[in-house]
Amino acid sequence: MLKILLPTVMLLPLISFSKKEWMWINSSAYSILISSLSLLTLNQHMDLGLNFNLNFFTDPLSSPLLVLSCWLLPLMILASQFHLMNESINHKRMYLILLVSLQIALLMAFSAVEFMMYYILFETTLIPTLIIIARWGNQTERLNAGLYFLFYTLLGSLPLLVALIFTQAQMGSLHILLLTLTPNPLLNSWSNDILWLACMMAFLVKMPLYGFHLWLPKAHVEAPIAGSMVLAAILLKLGGYGILRIIIILEPISKFMAYPFIILATWGMIMTSSICLRQTDLKSLIAYSSISHMGLVVAASLIQTPWGFMGATAMMIAHGLTSSMLFCLANTNYERAHSRTMVLIRGLQMVLPLMSSWWLLASLTNLGLPPTINLISELMIIVSTFSWSNFTLILLGLNTVITAIYSLYMLISVQRGKMTTHSLSINPTFTREHMIMALHLLPLILLTLNPKLILGVAY
C-alpha cells in the first residue's frame, strides 16, 4: 500500500518546487508512473499477505477502485492544462496540489481498515473538491453548487457518525475484518432499523439515490473539468464502496428497510433517464446519466446476492471510466465553443472528424454495448434483480431502452445537424485530447478479456 501512497505524497513537493515550464510535464509523467505501479494491487488472492497492516489493506473490492483513482490522476492533470492556461503559476500549483491532496485522501479511504478511519477520510475528500468547484468553476452559480454539495454531504453523513459511535460502544471495535467475522449482536434491539438507516443515509446521499440527488447536477455543471472527472469517476464510488462494506455488519438485512430503497432506486433510474431526454445542457445530461447508473449499483447492493455484488463493483468501475470520458468530451466542446448548450455546438462531425469517433465510442459505451465492461456489469445486475423479483425486468428493460435513446440523442445533437457559424472558426483537436480519450477507453475494452479483476470479493 505504501508503495502507492508515498510516491503520491511526494507529488506535493515535486509540484511545489518544479520550474514553471517543467511543472505539467513532471506531474503528468510521475502520476502515470504511479498509476502503472498501482496495477500490482490487482489480481491478488484473498490471503492478504503483504497488502495488509494495522491501518490499511487492499482486497479484491478496494483494489479496482484504488487503481481507478490512480489511473485518473494523470488524465485529470492532462485535461486541465487548457483550462488553466491564463492562470498565474501559483494558482496552477495550488490547483495541482488540491488534486493530489484529494488523491491521497481517496487512496487512504479505499484502503482504510477501520470504519471510523474511512468516515474521517470520506469527509476529508469534501474539502479539496469544494475548493476546486468554488474557485475554478465556470459561472458565478458555482458558490451555490458548492453550498449544495457541502450541506447535502454533511447532513447525510452526520447520522453515520452517531451510528458508528454506537456500534463501537456495542461491539468494542470498528475493524472491517473483525466485524465481518464476528456474529452480529446489533440485531437484538428494536432500534436496528434506525441504525441501518443512519448507516446507509450518508452513502445513499453520496451515490446519489434519486430523491437525494439535487446537489449532483449543480456540482457537475459548475465544476471545472478535473472536478467533474473526479466527482463522477471516484467520489460517487465512495458511496457504493461504503454500502458494500457496511452492509456486512448489518446482515441479515431487514426487508422492511431494504425494499423501499430498492424500489426507489429502480424507479429513480427511469425518472433520471427520462430527465436526460429533455436536457439542453450537455454536462447536466451526463450528470443525470450518472444518477441513473448509480441507481443500478444501489439496487444490486441491497439485494445482497453474489451476482449483485459483482455487478455493482463492475458497474462502479465501468461507469467511472465512461462518465469521466464523456465529461472530457463535453469539455473539449466547451473549450472551443464556450457553451454547454447542445443546440449551439451541433454539426461538429464535419469540423472535428476524429473527435466525433471518440463521441461515437463514448456514447456506445454509455449505453452498454459489447465488448465493454458496461455490458457485463449491466447483465449481472439485471440477472440478480430479476432473481429477486420478476417485475424489475420491465423497469430495467425500459431503463436500458431510454439510456440508448438519450445516449444517441446526445451524439446526434452534438455531431450531426447544420453547423453554426462559429463552428467554422474553432481550433483543431490536440494529441493530448486524443491520448486522454484513448486512456479512458483502453481499460474499458481490455477488462472485458479478464473481468474477474474488477468483480470484487464475491467472485
Curated annotation (Swiss-Prot):
A Pfam family hit: Oxidored_q5_N
GO biological process entries: ATP synthesis coupled electron transport; electron transport coupled proton transport
Primary location: mitochondrion
Classification via InterPro entries: NADH4_N (IPR000260), NADH_Q_OxRdtase_chainM/4 (IPR010227), NADH_UbQ_OxRdtase (IPR003918), ND/Mrp_TM (IPR001750)
Molecular function via GO: NADH dehydrogenase (ubiquinone) activity; ubiquinone binding
Cell compartment(s), UniProt: Mitochondrion membrane
Job description of the protein: Core subunit of the mitochondrial membrane respiratory chain NADH dehydrogenase (Complex I) that is believed to belong to the minimal assembly required for catalysis. Complex I functions in the transfer of electrons from NADH to the respiratory chain. The immediate electron acceptor for the enzyme is believed to be ubiquinone.
Protein name from the UniProt record: NADH-ubiquinone oxidoreductase chain 4
